[in-house]
């Protein structure tokens, strides 16, 4: 274990307290950003206390026992890609890499069930998926030519944010209507949780370059094989094993920063720490800020953010409806299918088969689901079942046993043009207080990778202030391969997911 950092022995801003004890850090928020910061700081020798208002860890990437169905459900399906180097590093720390199943193939389904499979070939990047695109029935040859031209424009570098939406960029680069609907919209709305006419060009380009162009390894898709809370509860164990503490059902309501300490109020009680990381959503942070001149610039920046929703529809059928683990769904409201009864671990799968007679449990996901927010659960379930039967012939004779709908109304921030100028760095007006969250200045959009990066960046900033020296937790990006190296690929990351791929 790295040596402990005792900031008061070397920091000119420190107090005169006993330096034989590790510095204490409060972390407000038990989502990925807070957990990543907590794990990094605990590893560096800080005494971490993490506060989470819910009875479980994971934030928006969590699961719980649904009272209406009696089933453990994820609030929404989360996936990762091989390019998510910091998320993979976080999973390594938490010891859960073996709970991710990796896939090379991405199946696009049309209504009626016709499938087009995108998978890498032996060709060098960025051409490794070109053969699969040429064979894809869901796109015409004209669509494919248009997509190829746009990919060629994005390959050399990520365009700057000039206030243009990615939809306008696509039209300016000659994209067909079907190429936009069946490729660009399908991929990017799911990745960025926003409509293309509200997405900034740099973030759309980043998703395309990182996941489709950089290398075959970068585009591998990983899906958890356990409920999400099981994935992240081990991060709490990691913090506890290093002398830290996790307080659940204990959200931070207020904070106060002094010269030598910070205090937080949770459940009406005040506790004092040396440092504080605020790893909460931007709207929650806005309600916590003091009404002082020093807080005004941050409050003004937070006022520039807006959110976009995600909806997950969970369906239990009396029989298997598909032999696919997951699929992209085209031309309908439902966007992705995740066959949860095929994805979960063998032990849990056996238990479910005993309870369910070998039926199917699927989750359908709708990103940027503003059109569903005002609809009732029954309306959404009826739509989901109807569309499932269009895509999966096995669902046409299947009986729906139970269902539930989970709406994350404020799931992510909207990555609209110009938003980057308002995304704050981890340092704040209060020297002992730091920010984390996927909405902060990470260089990534609102993804699990962005959340973990924000936690690591906050931990680095705190450790620098505490110890007066540079501490690095952030992992390098995945290296470009093949021809993409001609465009200035970055250094190979400390961790690559090749060994994790499950065929």
Predicted ranges, named:
Residues 343-350, 408-435, 439-442:
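FAD-binding beta-loop-beta segment adjacent to the flavin cofactor pocket
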Residues 23-50:
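N-terminal Rossmann-like FAD-binding beta1-loop-alpha1 element of flavoenzymes
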Residues 191-192, 382-428, 480-481:
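Flavin (FAD/FMN) cofactor-binding core of flavoprotein oxidoreductases
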Residues 463-503:
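Active-site-proximal substrate-binding core of FAD-dependent oxidoreductases
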Residues 87-93, 97-205, 216-218:
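Mobile amphipathic helical/loop "lid" adjacent to a hydrophobic cofactor/ligand pocket
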Residues 42-67:
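Glycine-rich FAD pyrophosphate-binding loop
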Residues 20-21, 44, 250-395, 491-503:
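Mid-domain catalytic core of redox enzymes
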Residues 205-267, 271, 275:
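Helical element adjacent to the flavin cofactor pocket in flavoenzyme catalytic cores
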């Amino acid at each position: 274990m790295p040596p402990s950092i005792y900031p008061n022995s070397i920091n000119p801003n420190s107090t005169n307290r006993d330096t034989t004890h590790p510095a204490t850090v409060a972390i407000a928020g038990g989502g990925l950003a807070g957990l990543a910061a907590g794990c990094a700081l605990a590893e560096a020798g800080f005494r971490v206390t993490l506060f989470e208002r819910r009875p479980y860890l994971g934030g928006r990437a969590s699961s719980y026992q649904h009272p209406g169905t009696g089933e453990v459900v994820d609030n929404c399906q989360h996936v990762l890609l091989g390019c998510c180097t910091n998320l993979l590093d976080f999973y390594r720390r938490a010891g859960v890499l073996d709970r991710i199943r990796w896939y090379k193939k991405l199946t696009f389904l049309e209504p009626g069930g016709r499938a087009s499979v995108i998978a890498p070939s032996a060709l060098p990047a960025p051409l490794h998926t070109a053969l699969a695109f040429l064979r894809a029935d869901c796109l015409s040859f004209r669509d494919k030519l248009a997509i190829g031209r746009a990919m060629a424009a994005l390959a050399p570098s990520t365009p700057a944010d000039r206030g243009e939406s990615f939809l306008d960029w696509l039209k300016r680069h000659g994209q067909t209507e079907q190429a936009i609907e069946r490729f660009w919209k399908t991929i990017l709305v799911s990745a960025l949780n926003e409509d293309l006419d509200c997405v900034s060009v740099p973030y759309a380009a980043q998703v395309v370059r990182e996941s489709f162009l950089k290398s075959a390894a970068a585009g591998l898709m990983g899906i958890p094989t356990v409920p999400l809370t099981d994935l992240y509860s081990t991060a709490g164990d990691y913090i506890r094993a290093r002398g830290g503490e996790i307080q659940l059902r204990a959200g931070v309501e207020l904070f106060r920063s002094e010269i030598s300490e910070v205090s937080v109020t949770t459940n009406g009680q005040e506790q004092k720490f040396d440092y504080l990381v605020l790893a909460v959503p931007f709207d929650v942070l806005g309600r916590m800020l003091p009404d002082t001149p020093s807080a005004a610039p941050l409050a003004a920046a937070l006022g520039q953010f807006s959110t976009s929703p995600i909806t997950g529809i969970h369906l239990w059928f009396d029989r298997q409806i598909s032999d696919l683990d997951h699929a992209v769904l085209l031309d309908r409201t439902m966007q992705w299918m995740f066959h949860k009864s095929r994805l979960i671990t063998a032990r849990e799968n056996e238990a479910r088969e005993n309870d369910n007679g070998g039926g199917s449990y699927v989750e359908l996901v709708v990103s940027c689901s503003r059109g569903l927010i005002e609809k009732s659960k029954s309306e959404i379930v009826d739509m989901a079942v109807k569309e499932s039967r269009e895509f999966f012939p096995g669902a046409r004779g299947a009986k729906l046993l139970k269902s539930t709908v989970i709406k994350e109304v404020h799931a992510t921030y909207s990555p609209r043009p110009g938003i980057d100028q308002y995304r704050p760095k981890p340092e704040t007006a209060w020297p002992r207080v730091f920010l984390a969250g996927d909405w902060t200045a990470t260089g990534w959009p609102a993804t699990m990778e962005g959340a973990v990066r924000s936690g690591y960046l906050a931990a680095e900033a705190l450790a620098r202030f505490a110890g007066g020296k540079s501490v690095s937790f952030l992992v390098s990006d995945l290296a470009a391969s093949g021809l993409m190296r001609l465009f200035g690929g970055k250094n190979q990351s400390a961790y690559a997911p090749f060994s994790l791929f499950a065929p």
